[in-house]
Amino acid sequence: LEKMLMCPVPSIGFDLLFRTGVLEHIFPELVALYGVDYQNGKGHKDNFYHTLQVLDNLAGKSEKLMLRWSALLHDIAKPQTKRYEKGVGWTFHGHDAVGAAMVPGIFKNMRLPLDHKLKYVQKMVRLHLRPIALTQEEITDSALRRLLFEAGEDLEDLLLLCEADITSKNPEKVKKYLNNYERVRQLLFDLEGRDRIRNWQPPVDGIEIMQVFGMG
């Protein structure tokens, strides 16, 4: 699977395994994403092919294997969290947290490393909705700081994953979403820079300088 993940267009191999029935035996959690349910004439998107599109989008931006795993698993809990709410439509509340909790079991079954790489993928899956939420509300410094703290050094990878998650066929929507993410990215980096300056402490203070030079 990892050889397929690292291909320029990973969806080709996964789609072939799916159509031949092989994928169901080696990765049933991924196959469970396939299909569209309807209620009151409303259907949700096919999350299997959406996931493959996200993976392809990301493959065009990053060659990091574990980030590609994150793309493959970002919506893995949608079957378990799928609900139809009257007046709202299909929802997948909590699929980020439930998906993160599923990652260790999937890694164990796939005989993947259960170390910092696992933790990284869990983090990406758990946080993949957070930047989206920031674009839909008034952005406060406290909300930005929470995301900075939780994403840590993996912030740019998280934003790449979020941008890859845009699979709309409407060019205007894609442009709008990308602009929203760019705004969030800029606000995050501006805040990070301000906080770094605010929290920086000089190695010596003014009193010490005066004492050294006999100015006190």
Regions from the PLM with identified roles:
Residues 46, 95, 136, 150, ...:
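A generic short alpha-helical patch detector that favors 3-5-residue windows
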